[in-house]
């Protein structure tokens, strides 16, 4: 596993809990001390899996290759940054390792993400006889598997799909992001995008919003965003007439975001800053990226768990033609308690909902249930064994048939 942030911490805990499946495990990251701390916390919690750690720069293909050649993993779980997907995939191909990630590739110098860069690896993974599993977090990931499950068991044709993501938690901070601030702010300041009648429709950032009611939470203002799983789902389920992704934001969060943008702190280009030298002898010109500097001063998402209250609610609202030939609606979702996630893994619910599915995807691969040569999005595999594990591993799902979808 590459990465040692909140999601990686959760995934590591869950791997240690399933030592009957995962017998050999290594965590590697830019800072080995972070990997060692995860292992220490896992062993303190009473899990006995032998976990190796290593230092690696995931931007460097040669370093990755040296690590993979030494350890010889069957599967590499990429929980590093989206900028690093392609270097890790290259190293996997060079060393005969299969691959799994939770977020699609995004170039560092452009706030833009899509699957085409990774789909371009299909033939190379196929020829090498290796599996690449893309987008195996919650959204993307579980939301795509929910859709596959609905298509397999409840619908002849899915016509309308709305993925809804609510974080109704309170971390008692004026402003903080629930995962890497740089990635988070880049994502939500982009233009919105949804699929309707065979084409992509673009909106201004956060332009479209409406109140949606979430189970056990109530109504929350939900905003239409561009989210990557829509891109693969409309290809794999061509009967879909419209597919959208919605996420909740509080007014305080949006006000901070507006100020960050207005003062130029969301910029991803380099600016030159004259930094005074420590000995007072003058200044040095240094290049900094404002958004990366902002990340350094914002709360670390890994430190939010302790005082986090409330829960997340993420699911799919689907309308289409059921197996009986009549129109039906279907809502499948999970609610996850921040407090319960923290008590189990030391991390908050947003990290938990991404880290658990990453482990389950790895389990599906290791058991031979999700193993075929090529590059695949998760909805292209059998959803049933994954759905079964969600209930066992801490993310139970619930269904509402023929309810009001509000959309």
Annotate each PLM feature.
Residues 30-34:
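Helix N-cap at the beta1-alpha1 junction of Rossmann-like dinucleotide-binding domains, i.e.
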Residues 45-60:
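Rossmann-fold cofactor-recognition segment
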Residues 152-407:
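C-terminal catalytic/substrate-binding lobe primarily of soluble NAD(P)-dependent oxidoreductases
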Residues 8-12:
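N-terminal Rossmann-fold NAD(P) dinucleotide-binding loop
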Residues 102-131:
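Rossmann-fold NAD(P)-binding glycine/threonine-rich loop
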Residues 56-73, 80, 84:
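Conserved Rossmann-fold cofactor-binding substructure of NAD(P)-dependent oxidoreductases
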Residues 1-6:
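Conserved N-terminal Rossmann-fold NAD(P)-binding element of oxidoreductases
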Residues 24-26:
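Short beta-strand element of Class I
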């Amino acid at each position: 596993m590459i990465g040692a942030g909140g999601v990686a911490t959760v995934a590591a805990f869950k791997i240690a809990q399933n030592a009957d499946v995962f017998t050999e495990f290594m965590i590697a990251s830019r800072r080995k001390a972070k990997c060692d701390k995860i292992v220490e916390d896992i062993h303190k919690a009473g899990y006995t899996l032998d976990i190796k750690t290593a230092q690696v720069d995931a931007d460097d293909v040669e370093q990755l290759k040296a690590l993979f050649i030494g350890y010889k993993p069957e599967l590499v779980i990429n929980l590093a940054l989206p900028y690093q997907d392609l270097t890790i995939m290259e190293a996997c191909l060079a060393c005969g390792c299969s691959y799994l990630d939770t977020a699609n590739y995004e170039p560092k110098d452009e706030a833009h993400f899509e699957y085409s860069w990774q789909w371009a690896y299909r033939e190379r993974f196929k020829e090498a006889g290796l599996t690449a599993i893309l987008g195996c977090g919650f959204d993307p990931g579980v939301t795509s598997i929910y859709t596959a499950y609905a298509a397999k068991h409840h619908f002849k044709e899915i016509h309308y799909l709305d993925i809804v993501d609510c974080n109704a938690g309170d971390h008692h901070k004026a402003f903080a992001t629930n995962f890497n601030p740089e990635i988070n702010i880049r994502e939500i300041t982009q233009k919105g995008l949804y699929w309707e009648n065979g084409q992509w429709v673009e909106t201004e950032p956060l332009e479209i919003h409406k109140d949606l009611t979430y189970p056990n939470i109530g109504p929350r203002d939900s905003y239409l965003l561009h989210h990557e799983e829509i891109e693969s789902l409309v290809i794999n389920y061509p009967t879909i007439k419209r597919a959208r992704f919605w996420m909740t934001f509080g007014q305080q969060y949006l006000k901070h975001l507006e100020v960050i943008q207005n003062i130029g702190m969301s910029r991803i280009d380099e600016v030159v800053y004259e930094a005074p030298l420590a000995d007072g002898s003058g200044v040095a010109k240094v290049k900094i990226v404002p958004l990366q500097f902002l990340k350094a001063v914002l709360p670390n998402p890994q430190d939010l768990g302790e005082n986090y209250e409330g829960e997340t609610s993420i699911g799919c609202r689907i309308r289409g033609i059921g197996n009986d030939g009549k129109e039906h609606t279907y809502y499948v979702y999970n609610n996850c308690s921040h407090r319960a996630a923290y008590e189990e893994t030391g991390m908050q619910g947003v990290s938990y909902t991404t880290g658990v599915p990453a482990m389950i995807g790895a389990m599906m691969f290791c058991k031979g249930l999700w193993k075929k040569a090529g590059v695949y999005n998760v909805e292209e595999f059998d959803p049933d064994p994954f759905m079964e594990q969600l209930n066992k591993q801490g993310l139970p799902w619930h269904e509402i048939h023929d309810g009001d979808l509000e959309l």
